[in-house]
Amino acid sequence: MLPTNRNRPQQRPARSWYFISDMDFSDPKRKPRYLSKILMVALLTAMCVVMLTQPPCHRRTPSVFSIHEPGVTHVLVTGGAGYIGSHAALRLLKDSFRVTIVDNLSRGNMGAIKVLQNLFSEPGRLQFIYADLGDPKAVNRIFAENAFDAVMHFAAVAYVGESTLEPLRYYHNITSNTLVVLEAMAAHNVRTLIYSSTCATYGEPEKMPITEGTPQFPINPYGKAKKMAEDIILDFSKSKKADMAVMILRYFNVIGSDPEGRLGEAPKPELREHGRISGACFDAALGIIPGLKVKGTDYETPDGTCVRDYIDVTDLVDAHVKALNKAERGKVGIYNVGTGKGRSVKEFVEACKKATGVDIKVDYFPRRPGDYAEVYSDPAKINSELNWTAQHTDLLESLRVAWTWQKKHRSGYGPPQAMVL
C-alpha cells in the first residue's frame, strides 16, 4: 500500500513553454490570456501550412499585362474610348499589339470599348481601366501595375468653341494631365510617347500650306493648351535622364469612321453643339437637329467660309502606328498629318448632302470666337520620313462611310444600361 501524506501535499512544479514568454499556468488569472496566445499561434501555423501546400493553380499569378513579354509591344492608349482613340486601339489590336485603354468616359463611350472587347476577347490582348488622368495617384498605380512599352496619348477635351468658354478646364485637362502622364512615364521607365497634337497650335499662319517649321501662335485656349503640352514634352525629352522616343503628330480636321462599320463618332448629346462639322451634318440629315449652323461667311477665302484640311480617321491612325514603329530613343519627330488639300465649309456641306441624300437646311451665323480662316497642311515631311501618305482622300467617300455607321447608330453606341460590362 502506497503511503499517503495528506498533511503535507507536494506542490506540482509549473510547466514552462519555451515558445511563449512568461507562461505560468499555476496562475488561474493568466490562464485565459495564455490560451488565447496558444490558439493564435496554432491558427497562424495552420494558415501557413494551407498556403504552402495548396496547388500552384490556386495561387495568384501575375497578369500578362504586368509582364514585359518578348516580341509583344504593350501600348497604353489614353482616351481610347473616344472617337480617334478607339480607332487607334482597333488598329493596334489588328496589328497584334497588346493594348491597355485608360479613359474616364467623360467624352468617350463604353460602347466603343465593348466593341473592341468583343472583337479581341483573347486573354492578354486588351484591358480597359476606368481612371482620370487628373489623379496622379491613380495614374502612378496604373503604371506600377502594368508593363507598358509605349504610350499613345489621345485623352483631351478638344472643341475650339468650348475652349473659349471654359479655358481653365482646357489647360487643366490638356496641359496638366500631360504632365501627370510624363511624370508617371519617367517614374516607371516608359520611354516611348506618341502625342496627339493639333494644327490649332499654329493659329492663323500668314502662309499656306503649313509646314512643321511654321511658327506656332495659337489663338484659342485649345491650341494654346496643346502648345504648352508640346513644350513640356520637348523640354523633358531634352534632359539627359529622359532618353525618350517622342513623336508629336499635329493633325488637321478628322472625318470618317472604320470602313468595316465597327466604330464611329458618337459625341455626348450635350456636346453636339461644339462638335465636328461632319457630326452636325449627320445630325441634321437624321433630323436630330433642324438644320446646320455655319458660323462665318466673311473670311478671306474663295467662298467666304473657313477652309480646312479634312483627314480620314483611318489614315490618321495609320500615321500613329507608323510613328510608333519608327520611334527611336533619344530622338524627337514632329509631323503634320493631313491631305495637303483645303476644302471650304460650303464644299463640305455640299458633299455631305450628296453622301446622305438629304437636302440639309443650312443657316449662316457670325464667326465663332477663336476660329481661323484657312488651314491646310504640307505633308511632305511625314511622306518622306515615315513613308506615310493619306489614302482616303475622297471627301465624299469618307462621308459615305461615316454616314453608313451613323444611320445604324442614331443614338451612338446605344443606351448606357446596355453597355455595362
Swiss-Prot record:
<dbReference type="GO" id="GO:0006012">
    <property type="term" value="P:galactose metabolic process"/>
</dbReference>
<keyword id="KW-0735">Signal-anchor</keyword>
<keyword id="KW-0472">Membrane</keyword>
<dbReference type="GO" id="GO:0032580">
    <property type="term" value="C:Golgi cisterna membrane"/>
</dbReference>
<keyword id="KW-0333">Golgi apparatus</keyword>
<protein>
    <recommendedName>
        <fullName>Probable UDP-arabinose 4-epimerase 1</fullName>
        <ecNumber>5.1.3.5</ecNumber>
    </recommendedName>
</protein>
<keyword id="KW-0119">Carbohydrate metabolism</keyword>
<dbReference type="InterPro" id="IPR005886">
    <property type="entry name" value="UDP_G4E"/>
</dbReference>
<dbReference type="GO" id="GO:0045227">
    <property type="term" value="P:capsule polysaccharide biosynthetic process"/>
</dbReference>
<comment type="pathway">
    <text>Nucleotide-sugar biosynthesis; UDP-L-arabinose biosynthesis; UDP-L-arabinose from UDP-alpha-D-xylose: step 1/1.</text>
</comment>
<dbReference type="GO" id="GO:0050373">
    <property type="term" value="F:UDP-arabinose 4-epimerase activity"/>
</dbReference>
<keyword id="KW-0413">Isomerase</keyword>
<keyword id="KW-0520">NAD</keyword>
<dbReference type="Pfam" id="PF16363">
    <property type="entry name" value="GDP_Man_Dehyd"/>
</dbReference>
<comment type="similarity">
    <text>Belongs to the NAD(P)-dependent epimerase/dehydratase family.</text>
</comment>
<feature type="topological domain" description="Cytoplasmic">
    <location>
        <begin position="1"/>
        <end position="33"/>
    </location>
</feature>
<comment type="pathway">
    <text>Cell wall biogenesis; cell wall polysaccharide biosynthesis.</text>
</comment>
<feature type="transmembrane region" description="Helical; Signal-anchor for type II membrane protein">
    <location>
        <begin position="34"/>
        <end position="53"/>
    </location>
</feature>
<keyword id="KW-1133">Transmembrane helix</keyword>
<keyword id="KW-0812">Transmembrane</keyword>
<dbReference type="GO" id="GO:0003978">
    <property type="term" value="F:UDP-glucose 4-epimerase activity"/>
</dbReference>
<dbReference type="InterPro" id="IPR016040">
    <property type="entry name" value="NAD(P)-bd_dom"/>
</dbReference>
<feature type="active site" description="Proton acceptor">
    <location>
        <position position="222"/>
    </location>
</feature>
<dbReference type="InterPro" id="IPR036291">
    <property type="entry name" value="NAD(P)-bd_dom_sf"/>
</dbReference>
<dbReference type="GO" id="GO:0033358">
    <property type="term" value="P:UDP-L-arabinose biosynthetic process"/>
</dbReference>
<feature type="binding site">
    <location>
        <begin position="74"/>
        <end position="105"/>
    </location>
    <ligand>
        <name>NAD(+)</name>
    </ligand>
</feature>
<feature type="topological domain" description="Lumenal">
    <location>
        <begin position="54"/>
        <end position="421"/>
    </location>
</feature>
